[in-house]
Amino acid sequence: MKVTLLNKEEVKNFYKTWGLFACKCYNTNPKFAEKVGKSCHKTRHYSGSRSFYFNFLIEDVPRSAMDQLARHEQGVVKNIQSQRYTDSSNLDWYVPKVIKKHPDLLEAWTNGFESDSADYQYIIEQLKKLEGFTGEKAREVARGRVGMDIYSSATFGFTIEALEHLMHKRLCYRSQEAIRELAKLIKEEIVDVLPELSTYLVPECLAVGYCNENKMQCKELKDSVIPTKEQFDIIKNSKEYKDMVLQLKKKKLA
């Protein structure tokens, strides 16, 4: 699995670009553009950021994870490797960590994908012989024989809102292994260029302070100080919570 940020130089100037777009709202001097961009992000005023995309080359990702990534729509552009226009006969496949732990399971997994690959090539050969199908015409039929975890590649672009949403959902411990691993790689690529974004690209529970999964909250956080949404709704209506918030506001005003 490999992720490459394609527009690193543009990402370095992300906040300035955002600010230049947003400065018009208050007729702010463009020399303050970077400061404006950061302020807009902190206050979640995203309209000026939506012309900017973080663009990635994503390689050797299981097709199952690619399908999950493609479900993200708002603020996302994508171009995914076609199994009709490209040959899948020599592609490798993803192996989950739990499968790697057990030799018998690994053997069954490997044998299955090797069989898929052999059947794929056989179907293409026979379709040419029996029907005269070649190239994409044969592959559009044979692709149904490849496994869901065969590797695929794509290019994706995300606005900052879309990236944050992606991380909220896919860095969650309840997300599947492969898509969570992919989300981590995407975050690493961005943070390597613009470290300030690290605190925004987090699981949803860390962003909002509670877990929307409620009874299905992950075992990693069940005993943590992060409440479920149902628990938080009770907490926020308590006298203790309201008193604490008012005290904090008074301290800030003092």
Feature annotation, model-predicted:
Residues 1-254:
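Family-specific signature for flavin-dependent thymidylate synthase
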